[in-house]
Amino acid sequence: MSRTIQVTFDAHDPETLSRFWAAALGYVNPPPPGRELEDGQDVFEAWHDFLREVGVPESQWNSSSAAQDPDGVGPRLFFQQVPEDKAAKNRVHLDLRAAPGLQGDERMAALETECERLVGLGATRVERHE
């Protein structure tokens, strides 16, 4: 029997990372428990309202955040705030497959398009590999 997994990341700013990864993967940031979002309502505003109502101090509102596959297929991503700086190279990274099945110029064009989209979301392009 397979198991459902959650991938957990340490972060300085969980909300920003979960926003980025939700947009990058086509995921969603889940609303607070028992809440449905009104049309156009920002999920993080809903979380802030919820946390205020249950008495969580504002200093702790960005202590964790999540992004999940709206179809329930991919793993949930959980971001937890940690005070320390990163001490070493990341031991986990996510590889996005932006051009499965494509080859040659068509593949590179699809990869460039995806790279531009991710940079627009806040990613940093390090280098290009052919």
List PLM regions with ranges.
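Intrinsically disordered, low-complexity terminal/linker regions enriched in Pro/Ser/Gly
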Residues: V126-E130
